[in-house]
A protein has these predicted regions:
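Short, well-structured alpha-helical interface segments that form or flank functional binding sites
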Residues: 5, 81, 99
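Short, conserved sequence motifs enriched in acidic/basic residues, glycine, and aromatics
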Residues: 63-64, 91
Length: 116
């Protein structure tokens, strides 16, 4: 289920995935097969888990019917934009943008509940 908390963690998880992939490269380049006590296989398993999690969130966003809901979620949680910047880009007031965001979060959380 996708929650507001998972959306808020999206950018951090994406950065973490990049760091894990960098550690895998370093372990491969130095030939040791390990890095910071983790084997390449352990890093790859963690990276696959993070990548799957991020993909699930993006799929849920893409399944929303409203283009405004999809856009506001991407701008806020994937691109990390603030409400003012989103409002300017979407040509809405900040108040309307907050309403759209709140409704989009509600819709994505509801979609996750019906998937169970």
């Amino acid at each position: 289920m996708i929650t507001r908390e998972k959306l808020e963690e999206f950018r951090s998880s994406r950065r973490e995935l990049a760091e894990i992939r960098a550690e895998i490269k370093k372990a491969e380049l130095d030939g040791s097969g390990t890095r910071n006590g983790y084997t390449i296989a352990m890093y790859e398993a963690i990276a696959a888990e993070r990548a799957d999690e991020l993909e699930r969130i993006e799929i849920e966003i893409n399944h929303l019917e409203s283009a405004d809901h999809r856009r506001v979620l991407r701008m806020r949680y994937i691109d990390g934009m603030g409400i003012k910047a989103i409002a300017r880009r979407m040509h809405y007031s900040e108040r309307q943008t907050k309403r759209i965001l709140a409704r989009a979060i509600e819709m994505i959380e509801d979609a996750g509940e019906t998937d169970r």
